[in-house]
């Protein structure tokens, strides 16, 4: 399908997003659970941010990291899900060239920053459980500030080139994206130019960043598990295993889905098209909806903070 001219990039000035090409009649039904998860994610993360901001007793490094995670989740949800729901409910499939690449930039940036934040939070739990006496001297406000700078700097170094490389390609005639989201490879495959370098860069950068984060997370939780198994009090051991186990499972889901998406995007002809589309959407809904529960609401201090907030209302 041709589109109006865009002098800076070729002929295409807008794209059409085709969600679930093989199951378009199901879109209204799919929108119901997606809408509920979106509302849950936004409400839970906003509540967590407000609670930590208003409660001075929660102004601690661990909760600053949790605030950063909630902020990343909110931005990711708002970047992707409203457009998906607009397609489902109102058939608003078109997206401008600039809006598509803006979505791609924010999505790539915040997903890699969230992966890095999970890694820093795993280290925080490692220090808290394996070296509790040294925790106040290691995990300080200065540590959180440096960690935040590292998260942003690493993202700028490795993730920023992804949308830039795609935006520099020429898009001549085809403008139909078989996805609900402007992912790098979904868009770049429409280009008239050779995209081998784009594919190679995303594969190498994705596996380097996400793979290294996942390895460090697994190492941190391995040390944590070893320390927890040495706890003699059965109640304390069970509580620690439950808490850290839920953290690790959620992180594993986040990282594994991202790595699977990198692979499926490079092997589209051998994998049903609707699978990566569904994984992309769920990846922007399930972790944001569960993070506040797993990391926040299950924490005694956060529960007390939310209760204080509700009493004020």
What are these regions (language model features)?
Residues 1-313:
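Transmembrane helical core of 7TM receptor-like proteins
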């Amino acid at each position: 399908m041709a589109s109006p001219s865009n002098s800076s990039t070729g002929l295409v000035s807008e794209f059409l997003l085709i969600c679930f090409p093989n199951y378009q009649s199901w879109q209204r039904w799919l929108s119901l659970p997606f809408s509920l998860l979106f509302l849950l994610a936004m409400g839970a993360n906003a509540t967590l941010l407000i609670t930590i901001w208003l409660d001075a007793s929660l102004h601690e490094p661990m909760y600053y990291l949790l605030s950063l995670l909630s902020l990343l989740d909110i931005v990711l949800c708002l970047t992707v899900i409203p457009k998906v729901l607009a397609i489902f409910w109102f058939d608003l499939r078109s997206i401008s060239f600039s809006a598509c690449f803006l979505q791609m930039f924010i999505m790539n940036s915040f997903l890699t920053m969230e992966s890095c934040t999970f890694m820093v939070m795993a280290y925080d739990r490692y220090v808290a459980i394996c070296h509790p006496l040294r925790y106040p001297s290691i995990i300080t406000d200065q540590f959180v500030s440096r960690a935040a700078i590292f998260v942003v700097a690493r993202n700028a170094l490795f993730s920023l080139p992804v949308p830039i490389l795609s935006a520099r390609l020429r898009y001549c005639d085809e403008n139909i994206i078989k996805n609900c989201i402007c992912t790098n490879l979904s868009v770049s495959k429409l280009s008239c130019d050779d995209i081998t370098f784009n594919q190679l860069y995303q594969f190498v950068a994705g596996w380097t960043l996400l793979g290294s984060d996942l390895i460090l997370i697994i190492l941190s939780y391995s040390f944590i598990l070893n320390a927890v198994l040495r706890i003699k009090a059965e109640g304390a051991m069970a509580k620690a295993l439950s808490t850290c186990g839920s953290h690790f499972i959620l992180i594993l889901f986040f990282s594994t889905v991202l790595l699977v998406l990198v692979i499926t995007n490079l092997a589209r002809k051998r994998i049903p098209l609707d699978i990566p589309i569904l994984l992309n959407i769920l990846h922007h809904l399930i972790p944001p909806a569960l993070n506040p529960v797993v990391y926040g609401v299950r924490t005694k201090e956060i529960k007390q903070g939310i209760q204080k907030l509700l009493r004020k209302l």
